[in-house]
Amino acid sequence: MVSDRRLLKKFGKIADRIIALEPQMRQLKDEDFLLKTQEFKQMLENGKSLDDILIEVYAVAREAARRVLGLNAYKVQLIGGIILNSGDIAEMRTGEGKTLTGIFPAYLNALTQKGVHIVTVNEYLSRRDSEINGKVFDLLGISVGLNGSSLSKAEKREAYSKDITYTTNAELGFDYLRDNMVSDYSLKVQRKLNYCIIDEADSVLIDEARTPLIISGGTSTRINLYKAANNFALSLKEHDDLDIDLESKQVYLNEQGMKKANEFFSLKNLFAIENTEIFHLIMNALKAQFAFKEGVEYTVRDNEILLIDQFTGRIMHGRSYSDGLQQALQAKENVDIEEETVTLATITYQNFYRLYSKIAGMTGTAKTEEEEFIKIYNTRVIQTPTNKPVIRKDEPDLTFGSKNAALKKLVEDVKETHQKGAPILIGTTSVESSEQIARYLKKANLKFETINAKNHDREAEIVAKAGEIGAITLATNMAGRGTDIKLAKGVSELGGLRVFGVERNEARRIDNQLRGRSGRQGDPGLSRFYISMDDDLMMRFTAPKTRQRFKALGDDYIKSKMFTRAVTNAQKKLEGMNFDQRKNVLDYDNILAQQREIIYAQRDDILEANDLSIVIEKMQITAAYELIEKHSTLVHGEKTINKKELLEVIDGVLVPKNKFRIDDFNNKEKMDLAVEIAEAMMQLYKARISDIPEDVVIGMERKIILDAFDKYWTKHLDIAGKLKSGIYLQQYAQNNPLAIYVEQATDLFNKMKINIANDVVENLSNVILKVVEDEEKREERIEVTDKDIEEILLETGLETSDINNKAINKRFDELEEKFKDDKQKLKRLRIQRDVMLGLVLELERRAEMIVSPENDQLAITQLIKELQNDIDIASITVEQIHQNFNNMVEKINDPEKLKHLVIAKDVLLQLVARMDDIKEQEKQTKKKKKKKPHDDETTKVKIG
């Protein structure tokens, strides 16, 4: 591997050539920048590579940044930009201008028109950087999008469609997972993952790599079981019933603990397969009680468990532990136990970022983790030189016997420094430690600002003011990372910013990040750590005797470079353990990643396909083979097909009726028979869908297949997660847990594919039958307009006077005989016949509603009025009705009026058939009218 020195020498020469173009770039007019961008794009289309055009592109971007921001990039910033384009991590000290550095590779790679993602650790930084750098990109003619958690899908799609998109790491990963859950390809928001630049790369790619991104859905809750597991954990004694590994923070039941578990839950064997769920609950309860601390890993607020980012101290809103650990913590803290979630989609940051064609990153400290960057991400860490020499003084640690002694000395030093006016930044490792220090500072009447998981809203504002005279800022870990602490006027003369770290962090780079807040751009400064034997790191990595000797110091301390080196070595050991843990997570996730890629790729194929017959055909073969296996029995050590049983299951249901006889199953290999059955399945399936519109079929097929994929992939994730949580027990049987996991996870994946195929074949069969049935019903109740009736009458030659069952059936019988060989015409005629017969039924129904024993005569009067003719009620005849009706039809062009007349005519014909009754009723009506005029509105008939 090429050394940093040689690379920096090479990149330095390139940077010099970029700077040499400055006079030429100064001649550009503002409108020339867009023309330059178009010219660069054309060069790439003509076959030039990014490296071929890098020097001129960076020179143009440098001039654009100078004009817009008033900042002329230093040589070291150009070197950083070259490192980023090469797909590596640029380690740049605090204050060296990482935001400006990112402009150059972003612009260069945006010219490919494939998209560039600039990733930050929070939305404040994304918004800030997109607003600042967006002005430069606007001059260059490059579009910029800002992604955020509050955006709609349409807004996200718009943001990702831009040349450059600013986004947070979490939102980027969740968008990827959500994109692979959509039911329509057009609903995706991201393009193909091309190139990303990750700000604070160590935080994103290492610190957060241990926590996978998970999208969860609700499932049934088990409140009583969680409470029982919590009560059991409370009944255990730390040394008698448990083995606790402080170094790795793992908790295990020892032999006595296992015995207690069996007694508590009335079990014979905790490790029996049927007790997997109980075992899982117990392990979560043990973690919650003995490995997780309130104020360190989580905090409780408003009856809710909120996760704390271990490396920034920020609350991770919207995040929760999976696999029941969140519920175990809720039981421990006696808050409401939420519904347990099931994982719908998951990915680790490690595997997500490896999906990009090229990744790069910037950070202040990453060299200590270079091995991990190379092994996992295939990226080097190259340290860029500072623009000015670092003159900050890094003092040896002050080591105390107790936390109280350390904090008393801290307060003394803060008081002394504060009296001189120099600003102070106090860094802590947890919210708990932050609150403890705050109490000491308040007791000493020192005014200070605090940033931790419980108070982070004003984070950037507080950090920005931390360099003012007399400022005291208390910050959890690397809160405010990404915001420079600029020294106020006169602070340099006071010795610059003092950084006091309370307790060493798990990783050296986090300590280095804290130190690096002081001494930016050649400013003076000082850093010092106050550590004690009560610190987590010391408890885990020092012997009890050593801790006891330090306790004897009382309030005194040791300031020794040798002991500082010993602490650094302990950190190295812990870094190695954490790397192993992350590598272990990755080893297991790699199996899931391969399976995820297969599922997501197949899902995309299904979303984009216009014809899914090949997919269905393969699934039918799988389903057919499984049916054969299911209906086979073991005879003399061999599985023999139960032919009769198999035939009964498939005949007329999955394959055409009488397609197979029992003899057809003789002397055939199972796979050959499965292919034959699958072909018959497809034959029946195609016959059933032949009359359904093609777009309806493809939509239905796509939905059924995607639903099956999502249903069984979710189940697979759940089972694989539970498998992984207990796989470590295999080591007690002298087995390799990872090898066993690979074997079992692969078997689970194959079973999942079989379940998907079975589900799709069964559901397609059921749904198609329902669609055909619904289609038939739909045709029966088809909505018909007046225009439809006119067209049918015209096409069939029926007269309006022929709207009765006999005439309609006679005419359509003639037409069906005539067109008996035309399948499409016959189908149309059958629909038309049903429409006309349905019309007759409707007319009869309306006639029954109109005609009643009490108002027949008034109905006739109203209907005659409807026909607009004077007819003597007493002598009305069928012939008169037809004659008047036909006369009226010739005069009317309005379909609605024609409809009214058809109904009126039909009603009159029915009434005439009962003429004798009507005449008798007329006499009765006249008698009634003498007594009282009939004014009942219900007797007035409104036709239509």
Swiss-Prot record:
Entry EC number(s): 7.4.2.8
Cysteine pairings via disulfide bonds: none
Function summary: Part of the Sec protein translocase complex. Interacts with the SecYEG preprotein conducting channel. Has a central role in coupling the hydrolysis of ATP to the transfer of proteins into and across the cell membrane, serving as an ATP-driven molecular motor driving the stepwise translocation of polypeptide chains across the membrane.
NCBIfam families: PRK09200.1 (NF006630), secA (TIGR00963)
Keyword Secreted: no
Domain of life: Bacteria
Residues reported to bind ATP: 77, 95-99, 484
Known catalytic reactions: ATP + H2O + cellular proteinSide 1 = ADP + phosphate + cellular proteinSide 2
The UniProt record lists the keyword Cell membrane: yes
Disordered: annotated segments: 920-944
Gene name, Swiss-Prot/TrEMBL: secA
PROSITE patterns: SECA_MOTOR_DEAD (PS51196)
Example of a GO cellular component annotation carried by this entry: cell envelope Sec protein transport complex
Gene Ontology biological process terms in this record: intracellular protein transmembrane transport; protein import; protein targeting; protein transport by the Sec complex
A GO MF term: protein-exporting ATPase activity
Species per Swiss-Prot/TrEMBL record: Mycoplasma capricolum subsp. capricolum (strain California kid / ATCC 27343 / NCTC 10154)
Name the record gives this protein: Protein translocase subunit SecA
Quaternary structure note: Monomer and homodimer. Part of the essential Sec protein translocation apparatus which comprises SecA, SecYEG and auxiliary proteins SecDF. Other proteins may also be involved.
Topology of this chain in the membrane: Peripheral membrane protein
